[in-house]
């Protein structure tokens, strides 16, 4: 192999040659819109997580109220069972969602 011939084929570039110049106003506006909290995937996800947290807290408070009031009638016992089942289902759903999301993130990281 002739090193002098290989050197002639290589291009030497500087950072100034690689830069594309300043971004246009349309590109900057599009970037800002994409990175904004409202309407972005991350913002929507955080909003949904906040709503799930509120519903979960509400269900726990309802169960606490039902457990604090003594009662032997079947209606109140069924209501307590329903509240407990709802909390359990929400916990399972959250656990499965988080597990799937972390699995998807791991897959994404492995492919890059």
Swiss-Prot record:
Disruption outcome: Deletion mutants display a reduced cytotoxicity toward macrophages.
Stored Pfam families: T3SS_basalb_I
InterPro entries: T3SS_YscI/HrpB (IPR012670)
Effect listed in the UniProt record for changing residue 105 to K: Complete loss of needle assembly
GO BP of this protein: protein secretion by the type III secretion system
Similarity section: Belongs to the YscI/HrpB family.
Summary of the function given for this chain in its UniProt record: Component of the type III secretion (T3S) injectisome that translocates effector toxins into host cells, facilitating the establishment and dissemination of infection. Polymerizes into flexible and regularly twisted fibrils and plays an essential role in needle assembly.
Quaternary structure, from the entry: Homomultimer (through its C-terminal region).
Protein name: Type III inner-rod protein PscI
Organism (species): Pseudomonas aeruginosa (strain ATCC 15692 / DSM 22644 / CIP 104116 / JCM 14847 / LMG 12228 / 1C / PRS 101 / PAO1)
């Amino acid at each position: 192999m002739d090193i002098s011939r290989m050197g002639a084929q290589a291009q030497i570039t500087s950072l100034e040659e690689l830069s594309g110049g300043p971004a246009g106003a349309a590109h900057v506006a599009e970037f800002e819109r994409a990175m904004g909290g409202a309407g972005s995937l991350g913002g929507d996800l955080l909003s949904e997580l906040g709503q799930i947290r509120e519903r979960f807290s509400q269900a726990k408070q309802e169960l606490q109220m039902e457990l604090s009031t003594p009662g032997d009638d079947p209606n109140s016992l069924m209501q307590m069972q329903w509240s407990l089942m709802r909390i359990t289902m929400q916990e399972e759903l959250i656990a499965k969602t988080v597990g799937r999301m972390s699995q998807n993130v791991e897959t994404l990281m492995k492919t890059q």
